[in-house]
Amino acid sequence: TNIQFLIQEAKQQILKYYTNYNIAHIIINNYKIDSVDYPYLPDEIMCDFICLDIFFVCLPTDLVLYFKNIFSKSNILVDQIICSSYAKSINYKDNLNLTGYISFIDIGFNKTSIISYYNDKILSLDVLPIGGNHITKDISKILEVNLEKSEQLKHNFDQNLKLSNDKDNSIETLQKIIFARTEEILELCAKSIESNSFILGKSRMVLMGAGSKILDNKHKDKISFPNDIDFLEETTENICQSGFKLSIGLNKNEVVIVPKKQIKLGFFEKLFHFFK
């Protein structure tokens, strides 16, 4: 009961001061019980003092409502919206049995998410306003081609493409553009990791997301960056599996958020309960 009270009190403080955000995940990183740290809550315990380290993952309320409204038009109610970058990182870390300091870099269209861990403890989650689309724009500007052509060149840069009759538009030039912007993204990620996670020096990075598909492990030597980098090949099945495994309790430290009020069932949900 005391644990529930502390979590609820912390949740109310977040909702009070971050009015434009919706709480997607609540993770308990540590239980400090009578000055002793526990990664998990002991089954039986008597104590005089208890303190929780709680990590909140929040999403903009406008974004949550946007997706809920899309499904609502088809009479489908959304019970939960999760942070895909967080869900994927938890799943891949578990599948690959990764330990120590590790950061997952999820490169999207216009944004890049960075989730850092130390073993099973999540240290930070940050979002940078830069992504794969910035590489496309760089190619478009320097090679003077439209965005559609730039996107095509970006995804086929390691093949023997004839860019144009212009001798300056060579494969080498294209690669330099892509690697330069990629190095910038990685450097910004490294700074974020150091400032938010207090990880000094080199740490392992795993790149994922649609924006990272232009690269793979054979290009690692061409990128000037000190950290150990791995490129993760993702499929739609991997992403969906990540969300499913998180929803059934993959992260044992995550708190299950229960709605205060009974939500009105949609048509298909009513049908499901009728035949259940």
Language model features by range: what are they?
Residues 1-102, 161, 171-179, 196-201, ...:
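Nucleotide/phosphate-binding catalytic cleft detector across ATP-hydrolyzing
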Residues 21, 100-107, 147-153, 245-261:
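A polyampholytic, Gly/Pro-enriched intrinsically disordered region
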Residues 61-69, 86, 117-215:
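Phosphate-binding glycine-rich/basic clefts of nucleotide- and phosphate-handling proteins
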Residues 72, 97, 220-226:
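Short, solvent-exposed amphipathic alpha-helical segments in soluble enzyme
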Residues 85, 128-131, 231-237, 250:
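Short, acidic/turn-prone active-site loops that include or flank metal/cofactor-
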Residues 91, 134-138, 236-243:
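Short, charged, surface-exposed secondary-structure boundary motifs
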Residues 93-125, 139:
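Gly/Thr-rich phosphate-binding beta-strand-loop-beta motif of the actin/hexokinase/Hsp70
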Residues 221-247:
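Conserved phosphate-binding/catalytic loops in two-lobed NTP-binding clefts
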